[in-house]
Amino acid sequence: ERGHSLPDILLLKELCRILEISADDLLGIENRKITENGNDLAQEEIWHKLQNCLEPLECIFGKDLVPVFLDGTYQEKIVEARKKLAGEGILMPLVRIRDDEGLASREFAILSYRQTLRKESVETEIEDASYIVECLEKTVRENYAHILNRDLVKDMVENLQKKYPALIRGVVPERISYGYLTDVFKQLLKRGLAPWYFSRIIEIMDSECRRNPTITEEELVCTIGKKLQEK
């Protein structure tokens, strides 16, 4: 806990990734009592606050920006941003939005797993929704390796299987676990690889892992990077 009463969120996130289980399963949310008096409402609030710390994408804002997120314009703009990012091979997670009294009235921040990725103030009310969504889109694009998690990868794999069943069937998660695929994909993204290579990454991973079952993650990342650069 690093000397605090709060859990180490980064450690919790990493344990979920390694064990390939959800935070609910790891924390035993369904069957553990964590209040001294057995107060169900208090227990629910505690788990809710803890789960909030595991949000891959969150936008918090000051009181004067609340109307922006109640307006239909925000919903329309965020859908457009999702479509644009999808065309680049990026699956944008759902954005949790909430007001925060700790921010200035026209200030907003974009967080991932409680880490602040961007924070600034909106100086004018003109096109507030457009500007904030533009910032969200840019932040996701620039920080996708940090935002990406096993659930997003699983959704991408399942969608890919609909169009290319032979590529996925018997491969993911049978030979390549979602956790391992996520780790390799994140490392390649950090090296500047474009996300739209996702299907080729799976194809090369499967080939290399069958050819050399003892290949390390670092060797695999290097091999995939080289093969994709040859194209």
Where does each model-flagged region fall?
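Membrane-embedded alpha-helical signal segments
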Residues: 38-231
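Recognition helix of helix-turn-helix/homeodomain-like DNA-binding domains
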Residues: 1-6, 29-31
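Generic detector of low-complexity/intrinsically disordered segments
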Residues: 13-14, 21, 119
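Hydrophobic micro-packing sites on short alpha-helices
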Residues: 7, 11-16, 26
